[in-house]
Amino acid sequence: KLVDHMFVGQGLIEQSDLTSELTYYIGDSKYYKRSRNDRTQLGDKSIYKQYTYARNVIQWNMNLFLDGDGNGEHPQLRDTLTEGYNPIPNFFISARIPDKKTSGGKFLSFDDKELKAQDGGVQLNRQFENRLFDRDTLLLCHYDVNFLYIVSLYGRNNKSAQAAWRDYVRKEFRNKIQGTLNRLYTFRTLQPRDGMDCYQFIQDNFQRLNGKLYRPKSDSNYLILALMKEEDSNIWKSLKIKSSTIKRETAQSKELVDALQTHFYVSDPFELETEFHIDSIDNVGTLTQQPKQEIKNILTGLVRKTDADYSD
C-alpha cells in the first residue's frame, strides 16, 4: 500500500540544504466518522500499519547505504558515529468541519486553514525507554484539517494557492511534532573538550549512550543529547509510561550528564525550534578518531655507576 502523504523535508533537529541531512515525513489520511468528543477513532490495525510503514522506510534507507547506492541523493537516517537515527515524523490526518461548540467564530468557515492536533492523538512505540534516537522509537501524531477549506482550495483549482497551502502545512507538521518532542525530551548540545578522546569515550560508553545521542550532520563537531523530561509527566502518563519508570530514567539521566561533563561541554537544555543554534566555544576538541599510541615491549634496567659496598 502507498501511504497518502510521504515527502522528504527538514529534519526535526536541525535545518539543512543537503539531501543527506533531511528526513522522511510519512502521513496517512483517515477520514472516518468522528465521535461525540470530536475525535476520529482509529483501529489498532491502522496504528500498527503506520508503524510498519515507518519501519519499512528505515530499512529501505539502510539498504541503500549498506549496498553503496546512497550517493548523497537520499537522506541518511543513521549516524555512523553514535549509531543514532534521525527521528521520522509519522502522522495521521483527519478531516473536521468547524462546529459551533469548538470553533467559535470559525463555524462552517471555508478560510480556516489551521492544522490542529487531536486531543490524545500522540502515541509512542518503542523497545527501550529514554532512547529517542533508537531506530525502534517511533512517535505517531494525529492532526485535523478543515474539510471545508480543502474542498474550497481544490474546487477553485488555484495552483499557486495549493502550492502555498502545501508549503504551509509541511512546515506546520515539523513545528507541531517538534513541540511534542519538546514536551517529552530535554535537548542539549555536546561539544568535545580539547585534549580529550571523545570518540573513544563514545565507544567505551556505547551502552549508556545508545539511542540518546545523535550527530545531525556528518561533519559537525557537536552532538545532540535527548533525555526523557520529567516536568511534563502528564504526557508520559497518557502514553502509559509508569511513574516509576520516569523517576528511574530521569535519575540515570542526571548521572549520565555528569559523566559526559568530563569529556564534553554540555549546554543548558534547549527546545527544538525552526532554526537550530549552537553556542560558540573557544578551544573545542574533536570527535574524530584519535591514533592510538604504539605500545612496544621494552624492558628498562638500571646500572649503578658506583657501588660503595663493593670491594675488590
Predicted regions located by residue number:
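Short, low-complexity, charge-dense intrinsically disordered segments
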Residues: 307-312
